Amino acid sequence: MRDGSARPASPRLGLADAVSIIVGIVVGTAIFKAPPLVFANVSSPVTGLGLWLAGGVLALVGACCYAELAAAYPHSGGDYDYQRRAFGRLAGFMFGWAHLSVIITASIAQMAYVFADYAGELVPLSERAKLGVALGVVLLVTGANLRGLVAGKNLQNVLTVAKTLGLVAVIAAGFTIYFAMPEARPAAAAAERSASSPAIGLAMVFVLYAFGGWNDSAFVASEVESPHRNMPLALLAGLSAITALYVLANLAYLSGLGWIGLCASDAPAAELVERASGASGKVVVSLLVMVSALGAVNGMALTGSRVYARLGQEHRLFRWLGMWDEVRHTPARSLIAQAAVSCFMIGLVGTDVGRASVDQVVGWLGVHSVPWSDGGFDVLVRATAPVFWFFFLLTGIAFFVLRHGDGATRRPFRTPLYPLTPILFCATCGYMLYSSATYAQGLVLIGLVPLAAGPLLYWLVDRRSDSDQHLTS
C-alpha cells in the first residue's frame, strides 16, 4: 500500500453507484422492525400509511437542501465541508470527530451486531460467538474497501440489488395473500383505536429513523462523476425509490396481516412469507435482514471513511488519516481507524467487562442504571441518536449561512420553495433531536462523553495551526 496522496482519486462513482449507496445505507433493518411500532401508535391504517408517506416527503425535503449543497460544494466529507465553511474550522473538526468517535462507528457496530443476531436465528450461536461474527463483519467489509473504491462500490451494488429484490419479494407475498389467497386474508378490524398526538409523534420518530442515513452519500461527492448533476439526481431518485418501497411494504403488511395482526407481530415480513408460500419465513427473512445489515455496514464504511480523511487533511492531530492509497484510490488509514473504533464499541457493549466499564463511567456522571436488558446495541443507538440529529440540524442551519454568505458560488441546483424547504428540514431535525434526547434521557451522556473531548483536543493541539495553509479536496 502506498499512501502518497492527500487527495481523493478522480471520480469513479456513477449515478447508479450513488443511488446504490443511498438505498444500501437507508434500507437497513428498520423496515422489518418499525412497522408494528408505527401502526400501534395511530388511530387507523390510513393514518399509518400517511405517516410513512410523510416520512418520505420530509426526507425528500432534506434531500433538496443537500442537493443544493452537494452540487455547489462537491468536495469530500459532505457535511464536514458545509459546516466548516459556514461556522469555521472548529465546527468542521467537531463534525469529523463526532463521526469518528460516536456517530458512524456506533452505527457500524450496531448493524454488525444485527447481522450476528439474525445469524443466530439460523444457526445457534452463543453470545461470544455473536460477538465474533459482529467483529468479523466489520473486518470483512473493511477488507473489501481496502481493496479499493471499485471493490467497495461493487460490493455495495450487489448487496443493494439483493436487498431490494428481497424486499420486493416480501411485498409480492403480501399482495399475493390479498388478491390470490382470500382464504388466508385477515379479517377486517371491527373498530378503530384512538391515538393521541404524542402517540402519533412517537410513530413519526420510528418512521424518520427508518429513513435515516441518506445524507452520507454527500461524503463521497468528490468521487461522483459530474457531481453538479448527479448528486441532486442521486439524492432525489434514491429517496423517491425508498419511499415507494417503504409505502408498498407497509401496504403489503396490512394486506397480508391486517392492521391488528401487524400491530401484534414481532416479525411481519416472516409471517407474510410463511402465509404466502408455506416456506420458513423465519429463515428467508433472517437472510434478508442479514443482507440488508451488511449493505448498510458497507455503505457507512465506504462513505464515513471520507469524513476522517478530510479531517486528516485539515487538522494536524489527525494528519495520519488524511493520506490516500494511490494505487487503490481509497483512504486506507481512515478505513482501518474506523474499523478499530467500531470493533472497540462492539467489545464495549457486547461484553461483560465493557458494560461494567460503561456502568462505572456513567455512574460518575449521575446515571445509576443502564438498561442493558433492552439490548446493548439498542442502548448504543439511543445514546448516540441525539448527537446525530444535532449535527444534522447544524447542516440545515449552515444551508442558510452559505446561501446568504456565499452567494458568489455557482449553484447548479437550487432548493425549491426557499426558504420554506430548509425551514421545514430544520424543524424536522429539531423535533428529532428533542425526541431522541427525551427518549435517551441519561443515556445521552454516553454519546456526549467522547464528544466532549473534541474541543479540548482542538484547543490544545490544533488551534495553533488555524493560520496554516491546509489541503482541501
Name every feature range the model reports, one short phrase each.
Residues 51-54, 122-149, 167-170, 335-340, ...:
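Transmembrane alpha-helical segments of multi-pass small-molecule transport proteins
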Residues 36-38, 68, 80, 84-86, ...:
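Helix-loop junctions at the membrane interface of multi-pass solute transporters
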Residues 81-82, 88, 120-125, 236-298, ...:
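TM-loop-TM module centered on a large, flexible mid-protein loop between adjacent transmembrane helices
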Residues 155, 321-328, 389-440:
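C-terminal membrane-solvent junction of multi-pass transporters and transport-like membrane proteins
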Residues 2-9, 48-49, 125-132, 158-287, ...:
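Helix-loop-helix junctions that connect adjacent transmembrane segments
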Residues 37-40, 60-138, 142-146, 290-310, ...:
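Hydrophobic transmembrane alpha-helices that form the core helical bundles
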Residues 1-46, 53, 60-64, 75-76, ...:
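Membrane-interface "cap" regions at the ends of multi-pass membrane proteins
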Residues 1-13, 367, 396-421, 439-473:
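Terminal cytosolic tails of multi-pass membrane transporters
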